[in-house]
């Protein structure tokens, strides 16, 4: 089971396809914790991506980290590595959710 609002290490693979994020990085779980699915929806992160209004930024493990809501995706649970490394506070998760809604025009 994954925890909504938790930040995990994820492996997005090494296949280079356009501008999609790849490799190992942190990812924020947005899927509901109560759903026993074989995939989970994540927002990948980056410490080097360009800032944007739809990319909330906050400190994770001592580094300023951007949440790439423009790269949201579902991945197999096997690509989550180990236990969460960070948990977003309620207001931090709300900030990311708001950015997702704005980016998707919801």
Regions found by a protein language model. Name each.
Residues 1-106:
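Conserved functional hotspots at enzyme active or ligand-binding sites that engage polyanionic ligands
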């Amino acid at each position: 089971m994954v925890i909504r609002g938790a930040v995990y290490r994820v492996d997005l693979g090494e296949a280079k396809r356009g501008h999609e994020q790849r490799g190992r990085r942190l990812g924020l779980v947005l899927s509901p914790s109560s759903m026993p699915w074989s995939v989970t929806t994540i927002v990948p992160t980056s410490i080097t991506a360009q800032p944007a209004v739809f990319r909330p930024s906050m400190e994770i493990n001592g580094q300023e980290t951007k949440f790439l809501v423009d790269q949201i995706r579902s991945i197999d649970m096997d690509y989550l590595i180990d236990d969460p490394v960070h948990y977003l506070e309620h207001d931090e998760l709300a900030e990311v959710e708001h950015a997702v809604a704005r980016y998707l025009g919801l």
